[in-house]
């Protein structure tokens, strides 16, 4: 009887471990920013989820492929008069994807190099990256 309980316990622990590992699987997030069209598309595991208007830099936003370096939900710029940068996803030094109060300028270059989004879209993106992980997120800017 004791042996049966031991086997049952081992099976239960193995099943729990498999479910835990399966539940911990995170999705791959791809954020693509098209500077010529001032648009961002977001895909999760290869499935298109969102297309949003953005504002990139007037004098340029770095092009390339990046991974998020840090997240800051309520960030204020240390470079530009403490400008609010809600839902910041930093990807290249001081460059970030973040919400903006200048929503009327979305769709055209307007920033000093960052990628600006409508605050509600920035919140959705921030939560997605936070949930799925910075290591599972890739940002391409072209």
Indicate residue ranges for each PLM-predicted region.
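A short beta-strand micro-motif
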Residues: 30-34
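Beta-strand residues in well-ordered beta-sheet regions across diverse protein folds
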Residues: 41-43, 69, 98
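Bacterial N-terminal signal peptides that target proteins for export
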Residues: 1-12
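N-terminal targeting signals for Sec/Tat export/insertion, comprising classic cleavable signal peptides
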Residues: 35-65, 127-128, 133
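Sec/Tat signal peptide C-region and signal peptidase I cleavage site
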Residues: 21-27
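Short Pro/Gly-enriched beta-strand edge/turn motifs at strand-loop
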Residues: 23, 69-71
């Amino acid at each position: 009887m004791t042996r049966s309980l031991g086997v049952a316990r081992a099976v239960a622990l193995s099943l729990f471990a498999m479910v835990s590992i399966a539940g911990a699987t995170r999705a791959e997030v791809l954020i693509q920013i098209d500077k010529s069209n001032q648009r961002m598309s977001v895909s999760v595991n290869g499935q298109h989820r969102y297309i949003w208007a953005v504002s990139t830099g007037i004098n340029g936003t770095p092009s390339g492929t990046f991974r998020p370096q840090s997240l800051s939900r309520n960030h204020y710029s240390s470079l530009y008069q403490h400008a609010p940068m809600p839902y910041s996803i930093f990807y290249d030094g001081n460059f970030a994807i973040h919400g903006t109060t200048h929503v009327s300028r979305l769709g055209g270059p307007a920033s000093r190099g960052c990628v600006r989004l409508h605050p509600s879209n920035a919140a959705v993106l921030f939560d997605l990256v936070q949930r799925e992980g910075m290591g599972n997120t890739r940002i391409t800017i072209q």
